């Protein structure tokens, strides 16, 4: 063997991969795949807990529909005797109602108990005739006819029942801001008297943007 052949053979020996070196990338790839799967599961778990349209923030992550914002109303029912009812029409601020032709897409009711809450209440929102005086008899009939979904909110030791929200989609009805005065929040105190300081209802009304919406949540 001459010198050139010896040099070439040496180079070939140096280029030969060491034992086990081919399996290293496969092992790393497998570990990467496992890690990716774990991250994917973690992301799904986190996504499930992120604020959505049903979350108290209402527009926390998904935000309102394009071109929409929302206005919130807070209602504090007065004392309601056991087995009795309360009703309140949706009255938006004048700065919003002057744009009465802007469409409303969704209404969400959130029930927030105060520390003294230990009752069971039924909550709903209904379109009611302008002539209705929201008397006990009228509200009772609306709860009984089954024409609207009802949120049953019960006392929870944790302070907040897991399901404390009710969402109404009005998109198909082409309802507008002017129609909101035709809707009312209704409450039925089923098992116990509801005291004035026991419950707060937050009503979020998602509607098309208006010129004053720069001061509203986005």
Curated annotation (Swiss-Prot):
Keywords: Capsid protein, T=3 icosahedral capsid protein, Virion
Compositionally biased tracts (Basic residues): 11-21
Gene3D superfamilies in alphabetical order: Cucumovirus coat protein, subunit A (2.60.120.530)
Compartments, record wording: Virion
GO cellular component: T=3 icosahedral viral capsid
GO molecular function: structural molecule activity
Region span, Disordered: 1-28
Organism superkingdom: Viruses
Role, per record: Capsid protein. Probably binds RNA and plays a role in packaging.
Family: Belongs to the cucumovirus capsid protein family.
Domain notes from UniProt: The N-terminal arginine-rich stretch does not seem to be the major RNA-binding region that allows formation of an infectious ribonucleoprotein complex.
Protein name per its UniProtKB record: Capsid protein
Taxonomic source organism: Cucumber mosaic virus (strain FNY)
